[in-house]
Amino acid sequence: MAYENILFEQADGVARITLNRPQVLNALSLPLTLELDAAITRCEANDDVKAIIVTGSGEKAFSAGADIHEMAELSQEELERRGKQRGEATWHMATCRKPVIGVLNGLAYGGGALLASTFDLRIGCERTRFRFLAATYGRINSTWTLSALIGMPMAKELLYTGRVVEAQEAKAIGLLNRLVPASELLSTAHDLAKTIAQNTPAMVQGIKELLNEGLGCTWAERMEMERHLLSGRLKPSHPREGFKEFLDRKGRPR
């Protein structure tokens, strides 16, 4: 299958997917999101793939989040339609049967931070930084993933403030499993993925399912709570409002 926005490689039981829009910090356009979703489906259907690595192209960013210029041009109806598609793709990543390792080669902001929080494991380097920015721009996300990773008090702090989390802090609070030099990111990830791939696939997948569903309240229930809140009294703002300063400062891409 040919891709325009991602790169796909497979060897030794491990698939590697690279977000490939470095010119816009690997912003998550809908075409990229759908290609990523299709690649995950491809991995799930292939018994030769035992583990998956997801990373970003370039040295600056894993992903700077949603493609704001793309979203700003849409009507509210189209935003909601595409938002549903994005939500389904995010859910698919979070519940992928096979273990997913995120290689965070740079900043993970907004939707990029949400995507990173759905991975089973995260490996970062000195360039890795997180920002969970939804509240800053009049939206809500990551409520159903982040607290399971770093605990409720810290999740509240990061979601309420949208502040930057540098690599060392991310490792200390559990947002990163491993922190290594940038030059060792991919080799560390591949070694870990190959170790996982040596184990019985059905058992690894069963462990993942049990861990994810054993959090007292299932991810599905927590995500539904988030969706219900956003479709009721807390309507997300349109990108033209939430990202007005960004759009005014950056203008249209050339």
Q: Where in this protein do the model-derived segments appear?
A:
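Hydrophobic helix-cap positions at the C-terminus of alpha-helices
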Residues: 39, 43, 93-96, 196, ...
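Conserved CoA-thioester-binding segment of acyl-CoA-metabolizing enzymes
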Residues: 1-55, 91
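Hydrophobic alpha-helical segments typical of transmembrane helices
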Residues: 85, 89, 142-145, 154, ...
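Terminal peptide-recognition signature
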Residues: 17, 21, 36, 54, ...
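C-terminal alpha-helix plus adjacent terminal tail
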Residues: 1-12, 46, 59, 162-168, ...
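Hydrophobic alpha-helical membrane-association signature
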Residues: 32-35, 82-85, 185
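Glycine- (often His-adjacent) and acidic-residue-rich active-site loop
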Residues: 56-92, 108, 218
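Crotonase-fold acyl-CoA enzyme core
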Residues: 91-201
